Amino acid sequence: MTRSPPLRELPPSYTPPARTAAPQILAGSLKAPLWLRAYFQGLLFSLGCGIQRHCGKVLFLGLLAFGALALGLRMAIIETNLEQLWVEVGSRVSQELHYTKEKLGEEAAYTSQMLIQTARQEGENILTPEALGLHLQAALTASKVQVSLYGKSWDLNKICYKSGVPLIENGMIERMIEKLFPCVILTPLDCFWEGAKLQGGSAYLPGRPDIQWTNLDPEQLLEELGPFASLEGFRELLDKAQVGQAYVGRPCLHPDDLHCPPSAPNHHSRQAPNVAHELSGGCHGFSHKFMHWQEELLLGGMARDPQGELLRAEALQSTFLLMSPRQLYEHFRGDYQTHDIGWSEEQASTVLQAWQRRFVQLAQEALPENASQQIHAFSSTTLDDILHAFSEVSAARVVGGYLLMLAYACVTMLRWDCAQSQGSVGLAGVLLVALAVASGLGLCALLGITFNAATTQVLPFLALGIGVDDVFLLAHAFTEALPGTPLQERMGECLQRTGTSVVLTSINNMAAFLMAALVPIPALRAFSLQAAIVVGCTFVAVMLVFPAILSLDLRRRHCQRLDVLCCFSSPCSAQVIQILPQELGDGTVPVGIAHLTATVQAFTHCEASSQHVVTILPPQAHLVPPPSDPLGSELFSPGGSTRDLLGQEEETRQKAACKSLPCARWNLAHFARYQFAPLLLQSHAKAIVLVLFGALLGLSLYGATLVQDGLALTDVVPRGTKEHAFLSAQLRYFSLYEVALVTQGGFDYAHSQRALFDLHQRFSSLKAVLPPPATQAPRTWLHYYRNWLQGIQAAFDQDWASGRITRHSYRNGSEDGALAYKLLIQTGDAQEPLDFSQLTTRKLVDREGLIPPELFYMGLTVWVSSDPLGLAASQANFYPPPPEWLHDKYDTTGENLRIPPAQPLEFAQFPFLLRGLQKTADFVEAIEGARAACAEAGQAGVHAYPSGSPFLFWEQYLGLRRCFLLAVCILLVCTFLVCALLLLNPWTAGLIVLVLAMMTVELFGIMGFLGIKLSAIPVVILVASVGIGVEFTVHVALGFLTTQGSRNLRAAHALEHTFAPVTDGAISTLLGLLMLAGSHFDFIVRYFFAALTVLTLLGLLHGLVLLPVLLSILGPPPEVIQMYKESPEILSPPAPQGGGLRWGASSSLPQSFARVTTSMTVAIHPPPLPGAYIHPAPDEPPWSPAATSSGNLSSRGPGPATG
């Protein structure tokens, strides 16, 4: 009966599979997986030897190629347009956005500049004359902003958006209106006379002071001008718009103001107004009918009494609307003010941006620091500036991160022996990876992949951390060359042993990022593609160029030159330790501290029944260790930390050695072999590990339920900035979004009026839609159009009843009556367009509230030309735009009676306001309701879709989790296939995928506890975590697969040889990520640094703790099985002929099995641990008992131990 030895006494038997399997392959009975891997390793061996022979050429050509690609960075384009970054590619939103731009152009109708005022003391009522006075001070300061560009002065009145400027036939009135027509400013000050102070226009009439909105009474002005001009049309226009006395009829906020007009209700009483009462129900612009600002647009944090009366509010908001760059360009094109500056749309955009920046600056400085109120200002340019700042590469962080990596790589590869130190290799490796990252990004720029914030802020650090992992792995393996390896084959032997791991991890990383590109968000798709390309470039650099660097360093070490200062010889080169041969008995060989060479006879046979290859080692070799070095200058370092990369001595009998400090005896390999693996692989430790990881998985599953969808703009903007304060106040108090319901072409609007009204009603009934006041009609073009027709129909009926309009004349009727006359006689027939008999037999709007289809498009032409304020208020944005048609009541020619019909509409929209959207779930609910309303309308033949920022940026969440699960599942399948193909072992690939799936679930759950919301960016990190996790698992799995012995023994050896590279890789990744923690953007810190740091720590724990335990329990059987017997039957074994592997077969073999006699020179390093380590190895061999001392080993020989 056999018993297992203590894990502290585990023997070394980690050997490259290709070398171990060589005799068996030629014996013709090895399984295909090992044969294929051996073939692949042979290719890597040839590649390494070729690079070593031509290392100078490879290094020169590699640096030249990477440097040329890095120059492509000069062509990099940084994208900051939110629509281009976040709208899903190929989605219905993308198609709808394309349709909108195709019909209306690129620019929106206007841009918004906002002021939000809050009290410094939270919860304080802001509805007081004093608070509104401070708001007036800030708004007035902002409205007076002027910028000088191109030799011109630009103020608000020149660049603001003006809604529906009417066309007036009277030239004097037209010029006066052009100068006086007010800007659209949505402000609570419009409830008071002080709102007029924000309007900067003025006009001059002889005998009067300058006319401004602060002293303009339109009714009084019309009375004064009436005797001198025909103003009937203008008067009707003002009456329809319900202008009244404009601002001078409103109460004064400060009745003691010397300019407070006498017509103000509180001018004589001198009493301050009841602010809450005046603001209740909202405010109006100069037109009471078309310019109504609802409470929700002006006030935030409102509180009401039980009767619904407004009592208090905590925030005020004013919004200034400016023209778009295209509108500003068109407005001043050909104007005398811009004829000498080469006016262009780019100049118009520059003017607007300069004004907006100045607006924000002055508004924020308008109130003193000790004021009881605070002003937050924001503009569309501010958002662009934030995105530009967010996308800029921080040179300090990049340089800092790379310097940390350089320092770590250099220190971890230094050694006390100056000639054997590899600090220069570490420096060169990090610099090479940095060049590879730059070349990968340059290649992305050459391929036209745009850069964004994720590229510039994260990718340089992430790619560096990933790329340096393989540098450590290669450098570590290069110094662990098997004794007896010819100098010219060192690089080939290194790639032969580690190339498979590098290929596997790189391919999985590239596959991970390519799978992450399935997320259809342009910014993240670009990031994923760039990451895949950068990983590919670092893979090429590590596999081709870095071996050339190692080969050059090998020459330096062989010549005993100093590290870094390679022109000087090492001072340690004169210290030579001569290892003298010893007089040994038969079969006894000397054992060195660093490695052991023994010559043994091995007999290999294949049993036909089991198809197993069996190697038999006779107990004829005795291993005698010499006295150890008391100062420990020759350290045992089988697979330790990269700071011990040169722990193995060159295979020469004379070698240089510098004495190291006693503390240098400890290293990661020593820790893994003597402390970590024995502790981890004990039965009770395995149980504890499984329980703890099971608990972590269960806790993560609970955390996954806490993850919410969303990404607020406040997460992107740096905390503590004025922009963040504004966005926080806006999100808290004014969560309103302007949206539109767009109707497309492809159906007949004239015959679908009922369906259009039903669509509007369904949309208006959504929970998130802000309803209009009960006293106001819906604000849509179809309602305005119908109401206008009903108004002129009523005027016609009145004129007809009074006889002012007859069958043959309308000149004595009103303007509206004349318009109705012309519409009523239209037939829509090109042959007979007029029919006067219809004057009394038809109506412009029938009893059901529908417009006769034959009049629909002709009436649309008349309405658009005659009611500009109503058209502007409706925000219809018709395409194709109806033709212009001028009405002249006194022109009775037949041509004037003909009304050209508008072309069939292909684009129109109903505006809405969405409120109460705080969480992503609120947005998703509103989007789903809007989509359902459009789907129902589609069944009625109306083609419509919703438009606006909620649908642009939040619709992705409808299918984000589905995309995430799809990408992760596809990636896990791809990882399984790649691992199974390269490892040629589905069993091992399945365990790797199991661990990776656990890592993804746990990362997702920890995100929930950290408060990280699920958006496209965390999805990319989660998907990429599968590929990055391969870095921590595949090395251990491959080491387990290619060693011999029991599962526990193989797991221990896998840990022994991979603990240090995996740990160094994790540290390198963490150092690369460390600089992200210093970002000014909280978004970078939380969503990238925190998430990727957690991912790295999870990978370290799963790769070095959980996976070895799983492998020791569920791992696959060894690929190479060796059995050792006390007295093997030897049939004329051939005599050894030097080192290496030699084999031959006996001429007389039994039919049951074939014997192959092998004479092998076995390189056993590091030195054997106390205890016997040659033991029987069945398919899952038991552990042999341990000996108590190294002397037992030499006395007993390597025979099996039985208990």
UniProtKB/Swiss-Prot annotation:
Extracellular face residues: 79-392, 450-457, 523-531, 708-963, 1013, 1086-1093
Sugar-modified residues: N370, N812
Membrane-protein topology: Multi-pass membrane protein
Polar residues bias (residue ranges): 1186-1195
A GO biological-process term: hair cycle
Segments in the Cytoplasmic topological domain: 1-57, 414-428, 479-501, 553-686, 985-991, 1035-1064, 1115-1203
Gene3D superfamilies: Multidrug efflux transporter AcrB transmembrane domain
Regions crossing the membrane: 58-78, 393-413, 429-449, 458-478, 502-522, 532-552, 687-707, 964-984, 992-1012, 1014-1034, 1065-1085, 1094-1114
Localization (cell): Membrane
Region described as Disordered: 1171-1203
Principal localisation: membrane
One term of GO molecular function: smoothened binding
Pfam families reported in the protein's UniProt record: Sterol-sensing
Stretches assigned to the SSD domain: 394-552
The entry's keywords: Disease variant, Glycoprotein, Membrane, Receptor, Transmembrane, Transmembrane helix
UniProt KW Transmembrane helix keyword: yes
Signal peptide: none
Keyword Glycoprotein: yes
One cellular component term from this protein's GO annotations in UniProt: plasma membrane
Cited function: Plays a role in the control of cellular growth. May have a role in epidermal development. May act as a receptor for Sonic hedgehog (SHH).
Family indicated by similarity: Belongs to the patched family.
Disease: Medulloblastoma: Malignant, invasive embryonal tumor of the cerebellum with a preferential manifestation in children. Basal cell carcinoma: A common malignant skin neoplasm that typically appears on hair-bearing skin, most commonly on sun-exposed areas. BCC is slow growing and rarely metastasizes, but has potentialities for local invasion and destruction. It usually develops as a flat, firm, pale area that is small, raised, pink or red, translucent, shiny, and waxy, and the area may bleed following minor injury. Tumor size can vary from a few millimeters to several centimeters in diameter.
Name of the protein: Protein patched homolog 2
Organism: Homo sapiens (Human)
